Amino acid sequence: MNSKFSVKFYEHKKLTDEIISEIIYVKSKQWKYSFDQHKKWIESNIKNEDIHVLLYSNNKIVAYSNLVSILVNFDGKQISCLGVGNVCASERSKGYGLELMTKVNEYLISNKKIGLLFCREVLLKFYTSLGWKQLQPKQYQIPLLIYEAMVFNLSRDFSLLEYNDKLF
């Protein structure tokens, strides 16, 4: 990892109001909602055990993602996975996303977890370059999904991935 960056993983229940405010600032660069709307989304969608991933540069949060505990069916077998959501950075073209996702990938590998993420088509090349695999529409059933689906750290073949919980 680049020495000018550091990454911290926080369980949601351990976040301070100050850190939540900093997260919302970074998220608002990507998604143009009000502070209160971002805060309400976090309160409604992130559980106490879910993880916030923060990339710091000069003691300032410059990129963010969250890891949410999810259950996914692979060919009818339910497996505990981590949903990777809200990947964003305070500025583009600074390498923040690369650093952040490199650490997310290391976390998934070291914790023996499969990662699932949803992204816009324009981001497929970025995530593929980091080892994520794009799922073809015939490989998954995810209601209301309007984005692309990708997996990471999946060592087995499967015919059908089913996920029926909230999008993250």
PLM features: residue spans?
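Conserved GNAT acetyl-CoA-binding A-motif
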Residues: 106-120
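A conserved beta-strand-loop-helix scaffold within acyl/acetyltransferase catalytic domains
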Residues: 12-88
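Residue-level recognition of the GNAT/N-acetyltransferase active site
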Residues: 88-92, 120
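Conserved acetyl-CoA-binding loop-helix of GNAT-fold acetyltransferases
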Residues: 94-106
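Terminal substrate-recognition subdomain of acyl/acetyltransferases
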Residues: 1-4, 8-13, 48-49, 118-168
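Short amphipathic alpha-helical segments
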Residues: 3-5, 80, 85, 113
